Amino acid sequence: MGMRVDIVTLFPEMCQQVLDASILGRAAKRGYIETHCHQIRDYTLNKQKQTDDYPYGGGCGMVLYAQPIADCLRAVQQEVAAQGRPAPHIVFLTAGGQRYTEEHARRLAQYDNLTLVCGHYEGIDERVIDAFADEEISIGDYILTGGELASLVVADSVLRLKPGVLAEQKGYEEESYLSLIHISEPTRH
């Protein structure tokens, strides 16, 4: 069984399309990794499938409800357990999270299961973060419209470290980020 990555998002089609393409897509087809994207709206309890509301204390923007995210995470945990896997390591992608580095990628690659939760709008109700997060990560000091791109950055950087994903295992060990000096790399043709 390869590493499993789940992404909890309002835009699962967007994320799955990227994960199914290129190197990660080939690795998934060969069974080296497994990726799943989950629609938060599928877990709402209202007819409108609304996932957000105004912040309790006022202020601008909308905040994602805790309930549908919590229910989605419970469903992911049950699905992972049904496969006989250990509980997933749950990471929330937030602007206030710890700055993501290659060291994080290498550490996260040690888990069998990783669940990435994408924020959107003004953020996520803090209660669900407090209840489920093993950690919070930010990919940089800038704001995106949602956590989908951040989750894909994390997923790609972690999954490429897993055996069988890259054609040559040495590929990830000899990348230019490991050296302070970067040389020009022309093609052979």
Residue ranges and their predicted role:
Residues I124, V128-Y177:
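Structured adenosyl-cofactor binding patch, chiefly the S-adenosyl-L-methionine
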Residues I181-H189:
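Conserved small/polar residues in nucleotide/adenosyl-binding loops
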Residues G2-D42:
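Glycine-rich, flexible N-terminal cofactor/catalytic loop recognition
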Residues C15, L24-G25, T51-P55, V76, ...:
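N-terminal targeting/anchoring "stem" of glycan-biosynthesis enzymes
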Residues Y65-H120:
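S-adenosyl-L-methionine/SAH cofactor-binding core of RNA-modifying enzymes
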Residues D6-V8, H36-H38, V91, L114-T115, ...:
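Hydrophobic/aromatic beta-strand patches that form the interior of the parallel beta-sheet core
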Residues Q39-Q50, D134:
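Short, hydrophobic/aliphatic alpha-helical segments
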Residues T51-C72:
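Short, structured active-site "lid" loops
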